[in-house]
């Protein structure tokens, strides 16, 4: 009996401990399978493929009824392996949404909208957070020869101070281009030669030149990064990008599914790219290039509208600027998939104001590490900076070498105790985003008897949503189905007007009128819509 009670207490302790930390791959799988088991009528969980590291790429579909026939939002987490928050956001959103599925508002939402959730597109890389040697990694388990010397993974990081962390390494050198931060000696910043400043340190990642080719840590474990492996502006042959677009099984699995999912009208990804806090501005020159390189003006306006919604709901501010490196999911979602595409890191280190009570002064030089350390101190967060420690490095036999700096992951992943509130805000945003979706309706239906067996049928087709049925760029794409209006008859005959009409798009709040002359009696039906905006069907008695 005592042994049983003790075992139960241990299990409760372990459950509580795991609840206070980011989820590893096994825990992610457990949470997803628990949702599928608890909500079988609202969910479908499938593994699209296994990575080269043997980990599942999951797709969790949430919705009621025929999910493939309703407008959908694709939610993508784990776009970068070092961004654990993105996967917590995706799974946490699913948990919050399903927990509230008994309420009328969410029940109605899931009757009209489908969510396709890809919780983690970088499971191989993300496990490095939980490994014996902890460092930030984005590449999967595919073996690569980054330095093109015919050898694989021969020059990885080395844990010189033996603390199980890979941080930074500074080498005292007369040609060093880094100096200590004027307001925080723990931090190194680049010396400004234009101001006559001189550096004292070389700043490198912790390790040794194992293959003696003059390069440091250039060919270690961690192959292809998902968020560099997509098709738009792919950086071919660059480290982490792959020799050509979509080389990886997980990339192809996502693309194969989404290109067949004609009902997706928006893609929301969690990662380093950000067009939600600050929308992408319209650039007329880029938009007019032969190969479109900028958002078309109506799509930039849609981005701005959704950005306003995001900022109102989440209350975020002071977002860092983001620049796409090519091959990323945000750019692919718009330029190649033709959908409304949004991305956010969900959290960033707030700007830390000086504590006047402690006689702190504003930083004379902005730096992310210095700002983080001040913010962490104000929040009572400890153990996130590793003091500089002198080590021996055979590459620098007669020089002072020190290892230290910020703990891996802390600049882009908040303390786990903050995650719940961040997930709640982004759940609210994703629910409210569905309120903006395009929605087709038929109004002003009229019939007029003209004699000789003829009846005029007229109606207005409207888009009740806040977004157009298609992005402007998407109007050019094969991978979006046009808006179709079709008259379905039995023995009747359409003698005036097109029996089937196709429209490229219908703007938010706009309408278009249709009229037909029908010979015959009885009942006909008119079906109108498209996968991204839903289908409406009305029956007409002649």
Protein language model features and the residues they cover:
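N-terminal signal peptide c-region/cleavage motif recognized by signal peptidases
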Residues: 14-15
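Short glycine- and acidic-rich boundary segments immediately preceding or forming the N-terminal edge
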Residues: 20-56, 419-422, 429
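Metallocarboxypeptidase
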Residues: 44-45, 56, 76, 88, ...
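Active-site/substrate-binding loop(s) of hydrolase catalytic cores
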Residues: 69-70, 84-85, 92-291
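Short amphipathic, basic-aromatic surface patches that mediate peripheral association
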Residues: 461-476
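Intrinsically disordered, low-complexity Pro/Gly/Ser/Thr-rich segments with frequent PxxP/GP/PP motifs
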Residues: 492-521
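Short, aromatic- and glycine-rich surface loops/edge beta-strands on solvent-exposed regions
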Residues: 522-531
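Edge beta-strands of extracellular beta-sandwich domains
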Residues: 534-542
């Amino acid at each position: 009996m005592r042994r049983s009670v003790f075992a139960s207490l241990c299990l409760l302790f372990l459950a509580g401990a795991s609840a206070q930390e980011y989820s590893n791959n096994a825990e992610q799988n457990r949470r997803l399978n628990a949702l599928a088991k608890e909500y079988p009528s609202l969910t479908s969980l499938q593994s699209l493929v296994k990575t080269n590291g043997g980990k599942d790429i999951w797709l969790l579909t949430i919705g009621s009824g025929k999910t493939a026939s309703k407008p959908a939002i694709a939610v993508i987490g784990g776009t970068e392996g070092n961004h654990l928050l993105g996967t917590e956001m995706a799974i946490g959103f699913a948990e919050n949404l399903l927990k509230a599925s008994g309420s009328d508002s969410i029940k109605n939402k899931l009757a009209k909208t489908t969510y396709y959730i890809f919780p983690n597109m970088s499971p191989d890389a993300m496990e490095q957070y939980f490994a014996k040697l902890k460092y930030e990694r984005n590449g999967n388990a595919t073996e690569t020869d980054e330095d093109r010397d015919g050898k694989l993974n021969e020059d990885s990081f080395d844990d010189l101070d033996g603390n199980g962390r890979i941080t930074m390494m500074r080498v005292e050198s007369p040609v060093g281009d880094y100096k200590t931060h004027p307001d925080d000696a723990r931090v190194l910043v680049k010396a400004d030669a234009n101001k006559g400043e001189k550096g004292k340190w070389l700043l490198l990642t912790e390790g040794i030149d194992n293959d003696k080719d003059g390069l440091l840590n250039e060919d270690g474990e961690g192959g292809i990064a998902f968020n560099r492996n997509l098709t738009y502006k792919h950086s071919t042959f660059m480290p982490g990008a792959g020799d050509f677009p979509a080389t990886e099984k997980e990339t192809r699995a996502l693309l194969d599914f989404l290109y067949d999912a004609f009902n997706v009208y928006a893609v929301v990804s969690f990662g380093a790219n950000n067009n939600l806090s600050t929308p992408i501005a319209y650039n007329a020159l880029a938009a007019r290039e032969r190969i479109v390189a900028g958002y078309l003006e109506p799509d930039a306006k849609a981005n701005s509208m959704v950005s306003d919604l995001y900022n109102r709901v989440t209350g975020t501010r002071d977002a860092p600027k983001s620049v796409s490196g090519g091959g990323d999911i945000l750019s692919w979602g718009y330029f190649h998939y033709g959908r409304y595409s949004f991305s956010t890191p969900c959290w960033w280190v707030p700007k830390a104001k000086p504590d006047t009570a402690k006689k702190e002064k504003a930083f004379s030089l902005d730096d992310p590490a210095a700002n983080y350390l001040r913010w962490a101190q104000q929040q009572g967060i400890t153990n996130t900076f590793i003091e500089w420690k002198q080590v021996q490095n055979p590459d620098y036999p007669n020089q002072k070498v020190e290892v230290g700096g910020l703990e891996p992951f802390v600049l882009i992943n908040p303390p786990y105790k903050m995650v719940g509130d961040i997930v709640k805000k982004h759940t609210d945003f994703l629910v409210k985003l569905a309120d903006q979706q395009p929605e087709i309706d038929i109004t002003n239906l009229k019939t007029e008897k003209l004699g000789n067996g003829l009846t005029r049928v007229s109606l207005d087709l409207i888009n009740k949503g806040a977004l157009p049925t298609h992005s402007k760029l998407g109007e050019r794409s094969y991978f979006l189905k046009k808006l179709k209006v079709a008259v379905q008859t039995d023995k009747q005959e359409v003698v005036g007007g097109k029996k089937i009409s196709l429209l490229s798009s219908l703007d938010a709040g706009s309408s278009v009128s249709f009229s037909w002359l029908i010979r015959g009696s009885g009942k006909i039906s008119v079906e109108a819509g498209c996968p991204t905006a839903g289908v409406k069907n009305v029956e007409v008695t002649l």
